[in-house]
Every structure is written in structure tokens, then in C-alpha cells.
Amino acid sequence: MESQQLHQNPHSLHGSAYASVTSKEVPSNQDPLAVSASNLPEFDRDSTKVNSQEETTPGTSAVPENHHHVSPQPASVPPPQNGQYQQHGMMTPNKAMASNWAHYQQPSMMTCSHYQTSPAYYQPDPHYPLPQYIPPLSTSSPDPIDSQDQHSEVPQAKTKVRNNVLPPHTLTSEENFSTWVKFYIRFLKNSNLGDIIPNDQGEIKRQMTYEEHAYIYNTFQAFAPFHLLPTWVKQILEINYSDILTVLCKSVSKMQTNNQELKDWIALANLEYNGSTSADTFEITVSTIIQRLKENNINVSDRLACQLILKGLSGDFKYLRNQYRTKTNMKLSQLFAEIQLIYDENKIMNLNKPSQYKQHSEYKNVSRTSPNTTNTKVTTRNYHRTNSSKPRAAKAHNIATSSKFSRVNNDHINESTVSSQYLSDDNELSLRPATERI
């Protein structure tokens, strides 16, 4: 009895997976599955009865044996029109379906899937609204006229997927997902779907259509086996089995994080300091880089940080290399303190330096002109030194000496009220000042 039912309905295990696949949606002259899909039996809404066309149904070899796998596995697919694909890391032509990627736009392909954990199946209606769990990044789809004027190269609301697009390679391990998703995003861009892919800021230019959503959903799981996906991707798909957009958004965000990590490592390895900026600013810059790496689960030890900093020191700070060369227990805080100490000492020394006077040439003439008079008077000072003239320093010494002796003589003259004053020398002479005359 059971074998008879299987003979009568060989596709009952697949439900209505191919019910809506008709020749209207997929051109018969391009799609390799058009012949088999157009002759498939039509099922009613309950998927329990089969009409009289059951006798013309092709063999079961074109249907995958595992009904939890969504990607079609036809028995034989002709090679793509643009020749064989490169086999390096790419799917074989019979799996790629590259002769017409529009096959993956069929919404009915989304009804059977091992990603599926929700009973809310998609209806095979091209005008079915987008699911509400997809974050609406734009309020409404752009007007085709305005969009064509502003972005002529951007696909419109209903994008025709390009044929003969090089497929991404199949995901082989969980560790390679971050690399694989880059190729998958490039594949979507080559398929005229670049404006619905999140950019570096997580923004998209327009909302995807229902067919585009089905296309992304089907191609994603066709090239990314569920058991090879990372844990965070599985958690998203277990909640909403077709929310591929959220997966792409978080993947782009993780790419940006990885790029920032690379930039931080490059900045840390190329540190340079010569005292041109304050030591506090240098310390804040280095500490910020180390803290950002720590937030991404990358710990930079004090010894490694000190070695990278010492490598970039120059000028008066260069001698710290020899001081820390023999140290085994390096502390980053101690190194920052010594850099701050040297910076403060140099700052104080620069403030205490005497001002440099501008030196004039010995043969330079300084002229002063009086603009208010009719006859211009020019005063010329010639600093040409003669042979008989004394140096300027000697003249200054003589002036200071003469002023000293004149100050002493004035003191002796003013002391007239003193009765006598004795000056002792080797001969013990006694001198009396002249008496005042009344």
C-alpha cells in the first residue's frame, strides 16, 4: 500500500516546493530546469491531491532525496553559455545553475529548508509584502523615475538578475566564514543587487523586493551549509530562518572591526616620539590603541608595548633604550613616567635659555632717514673697527673700573665730619683730612 502511494505521488515528501515554478517565472529557453519544472504536477492548497497530469511527471532523479535541502540537484545540467567555470574553489557547473540564476528567485524554493524553524511559510505571491522582522532601513521604495535620474546605475525596484554570474565557492569550514561572506557579497553585487547590501555604516539604498529576498535566501543556503555556519549566524537563522539581511549586516560590521584591529596593530608597530608633542598626548594615544585591542579580545602585554615604544623613541628620549635593554620586568606605567620626566626637564631648560640677540655684520651700515624734512638727512654709523680701537669688552671693563673708583672717592669726600681717618699700609702712615674753613 505504501509503495503504491509513493508510485502515485513521488513528490509528496516535498510538499509544494515546486508548485509555483512555472514557465512564466522562468524562461524556458534559458533555465535548465524549465522543462522539468513546467511539467511538474499542480497540487491543491492542502497538497493532498494530484491532477491528471501526474502521468507526464518526469523521473524523481531531478528532485533531491533530502527534503530538508533546498538547493536543486538536477540529474544533468548543460554547461553555461560562457564556457566552463574555473574549478578552483568553485562549484561544478551542474550545481552552480549559472546558466540562469533567476531560478533562485522562485519564492516556492523557500518552503522546504533545514533553516526553517517557523511555520510561517512564504506564499508564492510576487506581491507578498516583505516580512516585518527585516529591519526597515528606508521608509519606502524609491520612485523609479527619481531613482533613475539620481542613480542611473542603480537597479530599480525589480532587479533583473544577471545571467552567467561567477558563483561563490562553497563554505568549507566555520573558520572560513568571514572570508567566504566577502565572496558572497561580491557575488550579489555582480548580480545587480549591490544597492540592497549594507555598506560599511550598515545602511542600504533601498528595500529588497520579495523575489530578491528569495534569491538571497536560496543562494545563501545553497553555498553555505548550515552545519558549517558560525554559532552567531545559526542563532539568527534559528529565530528567523530567512533573515539573511541581518547576517550580512553583522558580517559587514565584523569586517570593519577586523580592519580596525589591523590599523591598530600597524599604528602600534610604527610609534614614534621625539618630544614634539606633550608626553600626556603620547600616553593617551598609546593607551587608547591598547584598550581598543583589549576590547576585541587582543591583550597586549606591558613588555611588548614597551618594546614597541622604545623602538620609536628619538632625540633626548633615545637613551631610554639602553636603560631598558637589560630589564626583564618592564612596566608600561614606569616607562610613561620616565618619558614625562624627560619632557618636563627639556621644557624647563628651553624656558631658561637666554634670548639670542641678533648679530649684525661688522660692515653693515644702519641708515636713518627723516621723512618730514625736504633735505633728507642720512646718518651713517660705520662699525668698521680700526687697529687702534679697543675691543668692546675692554671698554666696558674700563668703564666699570672707573665708576668703582669714583664711587670710593665720593665716599671719602662726604665723610668731612670725621675728625681723622687712618689708612694703614706697609709703612703705617697716618693721614688727616683737610680741616674745614669757616
From Swiss-Prot:
The entry's keywords: Cytoplasm, RNA-binding, Transposable element
MF GO annotations: RNA binding
Subunit details: Homotrimer.
Protein name: Transposon Ty2-LR2 Gag polyprotein
GO biological process: viral translational frameshifting
Function: Capsid protein (CA) is the structural component of the virus-like particle (VLP), forming the shell that encapsulates the retrotransposons dimeric RNA genome. The particles are assembled from trimer-clustered units and there are holes in the capsid shells that allow for the diffusion of macromolecules. CA also has nucleocapsid-like chaperone activity, promoting primer tRNA(i)-Met annealing to the multipartite primer-binding site (PBS), dimerization of Ty2 RNA and initiation of reverse transcription.
Domain of life: Eukaryota
Subcellular location(s) per record: Cytoplasm
Bias kind Low complexity: ranges: 369-381
Domain notes: The C-terminal RNA-binding region of CA is sufficient for all its nucleocapsid-like chaperone activities.
Annotated region (RNA-binding), positions in chain: 295-397
InterPro entries per the UniProt record, alphabetical: TYA
Region (Disordered): 1-88, 364-397, 418-438
Membrane-spanning residues: none
Miscellaneous field: Retrotransposons are mobile genetic entities that are able to replicate via an RNA intermediate and a reverse transcription step. In contrast to retroviruses, retrotransposons are non-infectious, lack an envelope and remain intracellular. Ty2 retrotransposons belong to the copia elements (pseudoviridae).
Polar residues biased stretches: 1-11, 19-39, 49-60
Record-marked site positions (Cleavage): H397, N398
GO CC terms, sorted: cytoplasm
